[in-house]
UniProtKB/Swiss-Prot annotation:
Subcellular location: Cell membrane
Name this protein carries in UniProt: Adenosylcobinamide-GDP ribazoletransferase
Cofactor(s) in the UniProt record: Mg(2+)
Top-level taxonomic group: Bacteria
Enzyme Commission no: 2.7.8.26
Any single GO CC term annotated in Swiss-Prot or TrEMBL for this entry: plasma membrane
One GO BP annotation of this record: cobalamin biosynthetic process
HAMAP family associated with the record: CobS
Keywords for this protein: Cell membrane, Cobalamin biosynthesis, Magnesium, Membrane, Transferase, Transmembrane, Transmembrane helix
Family, as annotated: Belongs to the CobS family.
InterPro entries (alphabetical): CobS
Length: 249
């Protein structure tokens, strides 16, 4: 598991992880079982930033610093995905044209709106989490990377070749359930029985959005995995903020 976790961190972050990178796509696929734990470590660094920046400058600036650190650690990997996905999905063009738009490195109007919206919502929801923000900041990236596995395992890839197809074809059912168990333990350990509600919201939203993406694109792509991850992270923060606002958490 340590080997898989190290490979997952190399793939998902810019952190300097000791050791040699994977020499094959299959080795990278095997690391997917550790994606949720990689998300937990990402969340730990983000939560530490929140603690430090909040102590120095208050919750507003602390929450903003946490969001910026979050994006920096991952090199905007999933943020790029939600921007590209928005440009393609809301172009209302043919399926082939949407896939072409998704490959374009330039960001369009809908992509910019989606990117700004997700960052702004995350920031506001972190503020709304109050003293429990650090817990939410750990759980959110954990479930976000778990949602990537849902997209890869349960939904078809849009392209016949590429890394997405390799991930889909070589992911085992046991990998999915192991990753699910890890994500569940982290969420339950930090948010107690409310983790069940958060899981339910994230799963339902992921299934609805992923099915829409499949109908629109013929399958999922690397960019749509990123979009699903970002949306899931935002939903975790949103649910925790709502529970705190109504004084039930």
């Amino acid at each position: 598991m340590i080997k898989h976790l190290a490979e997952a961190l190399r793939f998902l972050t810019i952190l300097p992880i000791p050791g040699k990178p994977a020499l094959s796509e299959q080795a990278l696929v095997r690391s997917m079982v550790a994606f949720p734990l990689a998300g937990t470590l990402i969340g730990g660094l983000v939560a530490a930033t929140w603690f430090g920046a909040t102590w120095l400058w208050g919750t507003t600036t602390g929450s903003l610093c946490a969001i910026l650190t979050w994006g920096a650690i991952t090199s905007g990997l999933h943020l790029d995905g939600i921007a590209d996905s928005a440009d393609a999905l809301f172009s209302w063009r043919s399926r082939e044209r949407k896939l072409e738009i998704m490959k374009d490195s330039r960001i369009g109007t809908m992509g910019a709106i989606a990117l700004i919206s997700i960052l702004l919502l995350k920031w506001l929801f972190v503020l709304g989490c109050g003293d429990l923000a650090w817990r939410a900041l750990i759980v959110a990236p954990t479930l976000g990377r778990w949602v990537d596995i849902i997209g890869i395992f349960w939904f078809p890839p849009a392209a016949e070749g590429g890394l997405g197809r390799t991930f889909h074809d070589h992911t085992r059912r046991s990998d999915f359930w192991w990753a699910t168990s890890c994500a569940g333990l982290v969420a339950a350990g930090l948010l107690w029985w409310w983790a069940g509600l958060i899981f339910a919201v994230v799963i339902v939203a992921t299934i609805i959005i992923a099915r829409w993406m499949v109908r629109s694109l013929g399958g999922l792509t690397g960019d749509t995995y990123g979009a699903l991850c970002e949306i899931a992270e935002m939903l975790v923060l949103a649910v925790v903020a709502a529970l705190v606002n109504h004084q039930v958490l």
